[in-house]
Amino acid sequence: MSSNMVAILYLFSALLFIFALRGLSHPESSRRGNIFGIVGMVIAIITTLLFKSVLSYVEIGSAILVGGAIGTFIALRIEMTALPQLVAAFHSLVGLAAVFVAAAAFYDPSAFGIGNFGSIGKSSLIEMSIGTFIGAITFSGSVLAFGKLQGIVSGKPIVFKFQHIINALILIFVIFLIFLFVSNQSPNIFWTIILVSILLGFLVVIPIGGADMPVVVSMLNSYSGWAACGIGFTLSNNLLIITGALVGASGAILSYIMSKAMNRSIINVVLGGFGGEQAASSTSDNSDKIVKQGNAEDAAYVLKNADSVIIVPGYGMAVAQAQHALREMGDILKKEGINVRYAIHPVAGRMPGHMNVLLAEANVPYEEVLELDEINHDFPMTEVSFVIGANDVTNPAAK
């Protein structure tokens, strides 16, 4: 296959990825967006395998089959409530893949056309170092995020003195190591960069509380994209550069939107200080309370005299798997002629779009699910705001 044909196919795949992002921006077109993404990835993989000299198609095919089987098994077994930790786990694999590709390019540069071992061009070394640095941070940060979301690690923020200063010093040390690596190409320095970057990834995520995990997941998504973009420059792969930049930019923009919605700074997210604030509670009552049980009909009966209801779901709804009961309540209210809508805060749940996924699973009509900017101005004219499992969003100081 000629290089011109490869460039055309890569460009076509990149366009399909852009269409996929466009489709995934709305629930009604999300299925079409997924199809665009799948077709684009298949074309990219086939083009790469036909253009590059592959040592063994059997090995590549076996790896694809094993990976596909594992992915299919996970997709069939995973519950909707566990999607955030699944996304975090996938991000960790992207970061780890970037590190492995960088290591392969460093130890066998001739296979990638960037020189020979010990005599790699400085520009390639810089690109390799940046991709490795971001990939290692993405890997360790995503592993810790997975642990927090899965409950393996405490979801509470872990804060200590001089945290930002320590993170900044580690970052400066990594930059210094990169300069050393570019100058002498030492394998020891290469692996030191990886280990220190992994440490920095942990330190960036540990001060972030569970309620703020959507921003973390989005930011790690951005990191994984930039890691892939950096490795794309090392491999001179235009498609990897384009797709990495798409993922990196979209993740960064989404993180900014969510941070702004919570009246917090995106800089705190990057530095690992997001969600570390703890509000003082005026009362501390740990005594057992009586559980009041009810069903969708009971809740609808209380609200039936209202003309309009806005339902604000949060992570508590996901934990209780109450989305189906919530939809039943909404259906009952609509039969009474009540205007029912769902308000989705950008950081509700544990990942971007978490509430949208759960409400879609419960077959809530797409037109009733509105984002913050679309519905925020309607709250003063609405009789009832029904908050379910979203107290940390409506009042971040609540405990």
Task: Enumerate the predicted regions with their spans.
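Mobile "lid/hinge" segments at catalytic clefts and subdomain interfaces of large enzymes
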Residues: 209, 223-267
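Transmembrane helix-loop junctions at the membrane interface of multipass transporters and ion channels
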Residues: 104-118, 182-188, 215, 222-242
